[in-house]
Amino acid sequence: MKKCMIIAVALAAAAVFAGYAPEVWNIEARKEFASKRFGVFIHWGLYANYAQGEWYLQRGQLDEEAYSRMMYGFCPSCFDAREWVRIVKDAGAKYITITSRHHDGFSLWPTKVDDGYNIANTPFKRDILGELAAACREEGIQLNFYYSLMDWHRMDYPAGFLTKTILNSRERKDDYASYKKFMLGQIAELIDSYRPGIIWFDGEWEHAREIDGKFTRTHDWQLDSIYDFIHERRTLVANNNHQPMREREDIQLFERDLPGENEGGFSKGQPVTLDRPIEQCDVIQKNVWGYKIAEKSFRSAADVVAMVVRAAAKDSNLLMNIGPDGSGQFPAEAVATMAEVGKWFKVNGESVYGTRAGGVGKGKSVVSTRKGADILYLHFLDPAVNVFSFKLEGKVVSSALLDGGKPVDTVLTADGLLTVSLPKTERSNGFGRVVKIRVAD
């Protein structure tokens, strides 16, 4: 523990000496965000009408001008912000991050600083972000905004390797000064109008290359000035860039990867931070972020619970994505899954919310979280594993299952090896079991 504290202090000091030090509000907001542990990502936009996923413009090789005309057919008549928030809250999630503007460049709010490519010029016309912000405030759910740095619609955006594949007959200008002015105008609108907790960037990776095993940034986004602009408005910054963190970034993001594991292939060369919150994002409709009608593979509630727990055991939040359809409804399969996840949280939430990594475990079979120095939670995720031993400093005051409170047998040897054995009748319910152990010196 002391070693971890020394490392964290050293890193904080390094940030100060480098010329940047987060303000008190920023540090407190980071801590509050980390304590939430579970959020819901929402990818939604014009692509929902196509029902082919959020990258359909690029992967389907559509003409951008033809694609953008879907704006005139976007009328999600079933959209109900309060219903969305109810589903999220009942699932045990503490925050929502929604795509205010994805790579296709369409804005889900009536922005005044674009060329009219936004919700105000659809048949629907209603301010989606405004309604969602109001519903979140009513229910105590934090709202964050995903914002794409990459833009397949605007001609002043300096095209990277991916944007250059978009079919478009208009002439490119590649004027970053103009594009940055546009982005800052939109970001100011988002923060001043809706008061999000976080601006969550994506798309910087379009201008990055791996050279000799290291990431090389091939475009100067002037992100320090953008981050300062956001921080001046008391809003946190996250950037899903698959690269080492910058000092002004408040949250480290891992896309479809647990910190340090790189199973999804996006995190190669991305060291895990020691001094800032971490968030892993993943999908409930297994292979897409935006709604895709042909994708019938959805994660089970047990899958989601295991992902939440494994993330928390690595000091990370989990941001689980749901892609609403063109009518504005969450897929029924996702709603059913999240309802079951919520039941688990009602019983076991204390083992996730406000916890830190427990520091003991056995691969994916047993992981742990903790609160303070005296409470440890063991999560038995593999039904075949019912006994776990680890070194413990101190003595056990009590040990019991969170679900039902049944006592759990523990044996502590003279050399400090604690063995925890699940009751035979309580070894598997599909979601694993959580043992709460209270310890003392």
Spans of features found by a protein language model:
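Positively charged n-region of N-terminal signal peptides that target proteins for export
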Residues: 1-4, 88
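Sec-dependent N-terminal signal peptides
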Residues: 4-13
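Mature catalytic domains of secreted/periplasmic carbohydrate-active enzymes
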Residues: 19-441
